[in-house]
Amino acid sequence: MNLVDTAEMYDNEELVGEAVHDCREKVLLVSKVLPSNASYRGTKLACERSLLKLGTEYIDLYLLHWKGRHPYEETVRAMTELQQEGKIRLWGVSNMDTADMERIVSLSGGSGCATDQVLYNLGDRGIEFDLMPWCAARRMPLMAYSPIGEGRLLHHHTLVEIARRHDVSPAQIALFVDDASARYHCHTQSR
């Protein structure tokens, strides 16, 4: 699977759209609405702008980028309608903590939240203590961003040595450990 992650904030959706145009059906396309645009009407308009810039009829996963001033009820209602209209396949959130997630899933339509995209890597593991178990108990996958710590982990002497011993790259070890840790936490929470 090929995943391309963008957002209206990144100001690169047109470029991404051009890049995936010839292989759109083979790409899982993720985009995000800015919190300042996350009112009911604003979310729908932001999605329309993203679809236009991306040159696609649908977005595979559309996320609320982080919490803002607009009530979650409005954003969830807009996301649910966008999904029903076929403009997005799935919707979720990004950078939400456990309290935010509890609030979101308690709303009408909130159970449709597919994921929370959060910072997670060998150097940033705080979610293992609350958010990861919470999501695992609900069988909601987490989506890690910066899984190799923006590259800063790739030169850590321990990671380099483990990678050398297994004849793989430090990035492969970092991704494997992130994945194994996520699976371990999901498995232990389901017992």
Task: Please place each PLM-identified region on the residue numbering.
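N-terminal binding-site loop/beta-alpha segment at the start of enzyme catalytic domains
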Residues: 1-27
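Beta/alpha (TIM)-barrel catalytic core signal, keyed to glycine-rich beta->alpha loops juxtaposed to Asp/Glu
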Residues: 12, 67-191
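A short, structured active-site edge motif that brings together acidic residues
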Residues: 26-38, 61-65, 118-120
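Active-site-proximal beta-strand/loop segments in catalytic clefts of secreted hydrolases
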Residues: 7-10, 32-33, 147
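CE4/NodB-like, metal-dependent polysaccharide N-deacetylase domain
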Residues: 43-63, 81-85, 107
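Glycine-centered flexible beta-alpha turn that most often forms the glycine-rich phosphate-binding loop
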Residues: 4, 59, 91
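Short amphipathic alpha-helices and their capping/turn segments at secondary-structure boundaries
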Residues: 17, 47-52, 130-133
